[in-house]
Structure formats: C-alpha cells, structure tokens
Amino acid sequence: MANAWNIDAARHTYAVPYWGDGYVDINDAGHIVIRPHGSGGPGFSLPDIVERARDEGLRLPLLVRFPDILADRLARLQGAFAKAIGEWHYAGGYTAVYPIKVNQQRGVVAELVAAGAQGFGLEAGSKPELMAVLAMARPGSIVICNGYKDREYIRLALIGRKLGLRIHIVIEKPSELDHVITEAKALNVEPLLGVRVRLASIGAGKWQNTGGDKGKFGLSPAQVLNLVTRLDQAGLKHTLKLQHFHMGSQISNVRDIANGMREATRYFVELTRLGVPLDIVDVGGGLGVDYEGSRSRSHNSINYSIEQYAATIVQSLAEAVESEGLQAPHIITEAGRAMTAHHAVMVVNVSDVETVPVGSLPPADRDEPAVLRHLREVHDELDTRPPLELFHEAQHHLQEGQALYALGQLSLAARARLDELFYAIANAVRARLSPAERSHRQALDELDEKLVDKYFVNFSVFESIPDVWAIDQIFPIAPIARLHEQPTRRGVLVDLTCDSDGRIDNYVDAEGVDVSLPLHALKEGEAYRLGIFMVGAYQETLGDIHNLFGDTDAVNVRVDGGNYVFAHKRRGDTTDLMLDYVGYDLEALRRSYRERIAAAGIDGEQAEGLFVTLNEGLTGYTYLSEGVR
C-alpha cells in the first residue's frame, strides 16, 4: 500500500482540489503550494514562505494572508454577474458590496476597494464600521448602512452623503425614520433610503436565524406599508430607492436562494405598484463557500457555483420585471464570506504528540486481577469469535476495571495494564471491521475516536478559529510539508488552552468529514507544521482571548511577477498587552516581582537576572516558542 502513495494520493486524501478552488495545490516536493491568481497563476511553497517569515523575525502560530486572492475572488464574482446579465439580457447593472464585519482588517478593505474600482461598494453595520467606511470608500461609490441606528449613526451617514458618497440608509426598524427626518432637515441634505424587508423564506443551516420571520432585522409586511405611508406624508417617498433583504449566511442549497428570490421579487413588484421608485435590489449575503469540498447541502458546503448563484438571482429579477413590465433594478450583493474566506491560512506547529498504545499485549502477572484475566481471554478469542462481540465484551471489562480502580480495588499498575489490554483488543478488532458492513459502522466510529493520537498544537482555537468552538464550523486542515510521504498515524488536534473545548473534532478528508486526520509521525529535531485553511472570513474579528492568548503574528504575501514579496508584517500580541487589556497595572506587576525577589533573600546579579527573565516573560509572545528549525 505504501508504494501506491504519491502526490495525487495526497491531494485526494486531504481533498485539496475540492475545497482549494484552484488556490491550493501540492507540489512534487510534498509542499502545500498557494496560487493567489488561481490554478493558472504562479504557485508559492507555503513551507518556504513560513521559513522566510521566521528568518525575518516572525513566529508561529502565523497567519499568512494572500491579498491577491481577494482581488481574484472579487473578479470571479463580478465576472459571474456580468455573464448572467448578458445571458438573460438583463437591463440592470451589478455592484459587489463588501460588508466589512466579515473582516474589518484595513488591509482587507483597502485591497478590495482598490480591486473593485468603480464597480464596488462597502457596507457598515455599526458606528465604528461606518467611521472606517467613510474614510475608505472611493468618492461617489455606494455605501450601505445596515444595523440598528441611533440619531448619531444617521447623522454621520448623512454627513457622508454631503461628502459625495452614495450612502443608502437602510431602515431596519420603524423608529429609525424619525431620526432620518430630523437629521436630514438639520443638515439640509436629502437622504437616500432603503428598506429591509423580512422574508418568510429561510435557508437551512447554522446561520438560518439571520433570515426568515424570526430574523433579528427587517420590517414585517405591515411595517413596510406603514413606512411607505409615513414617507409619503413627509414628502420623502421619492428617496426610497433601495430594497434590501437577507436570506441567510452560508446558504448551502441553491434552491433556498431561488425560493428567497421568488418572495423578494414580489416585494419589489408590490412596492413599485405603490409608487415607490425602487431602482436597486440589495440581496444581502448568503453566497457560501465549500469548506469541506463535498459540493453538497451540508452546512459547511454548497451545492452550487458562483456562476449558478449569479444566474439564480439575475433570472429571478429578469423574469419578475419582464412579467410586470417594470424597469430592471440595479443588483447589489453583500457576499463577504465568498470574497474573503480563501485568502488566509493559519500555520501552526505541533508541540507534542500523545500516541495510543501500539497494540502489543502486555505480559501477564501471576497474581493478575480477574478483570485483566477476562480481557486476556477476550484477546485469545480474536480469531474465533465475531469482532463486534469481542469489542462489546472488551468495553464491558474496561468499564468494570475503571469502576474497581475508582473504588480502590485495583492498583495503578493494574489500571495501566487494563488500558494496554483494551487497546490491544481494540486495534485488532478495528482491523477486522469493514465500513461496508452496516452493523460495523457504529463500532468503527467509536474505535476511530479512541484509536487516534493527540497532536498538541501551538495555537488557540478560541482566538484563531472561534467558529470551530461556537458553531462546529469545519475548516480544511493539512500538513504543509511531507506530503510526498504517506501519513501513518491518525490524530486529533488539541490547542494550548486549559479548556476541553479547545480541540478540533471534525476534519475534511476524501470521503467528506471524519473524526480524525491522517498525519505523520514526528521526526526528531524537525518541525511539523499544519495549515488551517479558509480562515479569512469572520475568524480574526470573532477571536477570543481565552487564557490570554492574543493575536498571532501575521504576514501579507503579495505576488510580484513570478515571485512573491512580504507586503506587510505584524507582530502578534505580547503578554503585557493582554494583561493591560484585562486591567493589570504593568508597573505594579514589575514592582511586585522585585519585592518578591527581595523577600526571597535573593540579591546581586542573581536578583537582577531573575528580574530580567520575568520582564522578558512579561513582554514576550503569548504562544510557545517553536524550538526547532
């Protein structure tokens, strides 16, 4: 079997062609390669990038961003809508709007603004985001103001309108209109308004509460009608130019998009009949990405392409306006996840491994407890009895032995042999089970969870991939090197935090999703590094400082001809910064260190040396040192 391993086998094992979308590949040296311009562009070895970053003073864990992927994703999105508009002879245009909540990093926003030129806009959902957008948006470009708004938010948005931006204030709740009317008069500026309608249609998935009747935002049908009446009474009906709705986030099934569009177009038709001069339809978010590469309706996948998504939206609007004899509205999408997810990879190093027992039978003691003798009898019958019977019997004796140990009736040495015997049986049983046998599948799942190594990884799930903990999000993971070697172990990844949730339970592989990941045995003196891919959407913003692990080091890698350059490097958070954030007085800490050194009776050079070491700990990286090159 080992002779059959090659680079294609590695691609298949880690499902790289399916989730990589042309941006990720494996070269003949077994290195992960990143192609920022897609499959036809130059590729760069991720291990080489990491080594160069370390040479320039950066440390692991390391967030590696590829800004050129952002531009490529935007171009794909714009191209898909241009194609659909042409095929359907649609008279309206299209603008891609980026909701900066997905990733507010200035470099991300600036890259997309530069790449989008005039066919691009920004969305803000809060006052801080609006302040960033007012400075970053191109003059004359579209800006969408979503989220709940107070008078100050609306005043700031109207100031942006005076400054030449096409700012649409989207009414999310009825009370916002009062602030709009008051502030518009005070500033002597005519607003551009939108209305967010709350669709009954809802897509299945982990983010379904962002759409549908139970959605947090948007107006009900009665509230929409009341808004139109109030605008008419205030002489502002002509300012309502935009209809907005949100079908959900990471919509997996293209049929859900079609259903949502069917309902949304009815709102457009009905509002137009009421004399509302709508000329923009903002379909919000929902365009997903295929994290697991299965092209399915799984929550972490999608069963459609960007082209199919664009065609579904354009077709829905084209058919609606044609049947009603209406003017085709301009289309806006807020597909932030699809723009940003692929552009970032978190590179982490394995600091240690806890391996499961290899399966050899420990020698018997003359006075061995009965529970151990029973397990040996099970082992002796491996070749003569059905494997499921043996597995269930072994589980029974394991639980019996664990109970005896808790009652003080089994020694620590006997407790250790209990585990060794059980794992010897479990390994043998696992080899005799087949996933083709339906009756074997539950036992296989249990054994696959038990018979895996623990790989201790130098990072925090809560800081770097918080959606793994929060919503069981799946991100593709693979070793970044040694992929020309067949992995001989299976493992689960656990992080540095003192929390049982600081682990990854599900992994992308060739068959979809599994409870463990194929990995290599560690080599003495050689770093073993993994890439956690597609972390460019939401993860940096949602990251949590559990155990005071802060932001990691980061580097932006930009294509420069046939090579690459580091466009920007950022050192991660230090311990003093994290302690200051949670209210510690740093100088008081230093004074305390000196006082404790003196109280311990230490003075002179030794005292100074200890203080220097403590101070270095205070100003150091919050993560572990890698220790090998």
Locations of the language-model features?
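Flexible, glycine/charged-enriched surface loops at secondary-structure junctions
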Residues: 60, 64, 86-91, 274-278, ...
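Low-complexity, highly charged intrinsically disordered N-terminal segments
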Residues: 26-99, 104
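Short, glycine-/Ser/Thr-/acidic-enriched flexible segments
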Residues: 31, 39, 69, 103-105, ...
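Active-site-proximal beta-alpha core segment in soluble small-molecule metabolic enzymes
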Residues: 89-282, 287-292, 303-308, 316, ...
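Conserved, well-structured core domains of diverse proteins
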Residues: 1-59, 558, 565, 574-576
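A non-catalytic, amphipathic alpha-helix used as a structural packing/dimerization or gating element
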Residues: 68-76, 226, 263, 312
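Charged (often Lys/Glu-rich) extended helix/loop segments that serve as interaction or gating elements
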Residues: 314, 318-629
